[in-house]
Amino acid sequence: MRFLAQVEATGLCWTVVAPTHKAVGVLRSYLAGAGLSPTWFPSTIHRLLRLKLKRQRDIERCEETEQTAVALEHLGLVLIDEASMVDSTLLEISLRCAHPFRTRLVFVGDPAQLPPVGEPVSPVFSLGRASRAELRQVVRHQGPVLRLASG
């Protein structure tokens, strides 16, 4: 939240998104608790990019609409939480939409989480041209489950 407070202090237009409504709800709670007010209301990444969801058998796929290309026009920064869930198509659309407007995309996620459905790995963590930072200390979870997971 400190990072977003610094972004807000600069006056940059920003928002946060996530692949699922549940994750967006958690983000909204944290932002409200921290007294942060994103320029755009937090939503799913699909909604921000104005994508249409189509179901193909058991998998949902996203398709661009006429508004997708300009979806990030007024945003300087978009924080994308739960980035391990972002599939190749969604990542490609996000990068393509951000490029013309120089919108900064900050992907936050855990490479140890399951990859998107139908993909062997999470493509976000394979971006070659991106800067990376790694958290080494677990802050939110404590107790026996953490001890078991940490070995």
Locations of the language-model features?
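Conserved ATP-binding/catalytic motifs of P-loop helicase motor domains
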Residues: 1-151
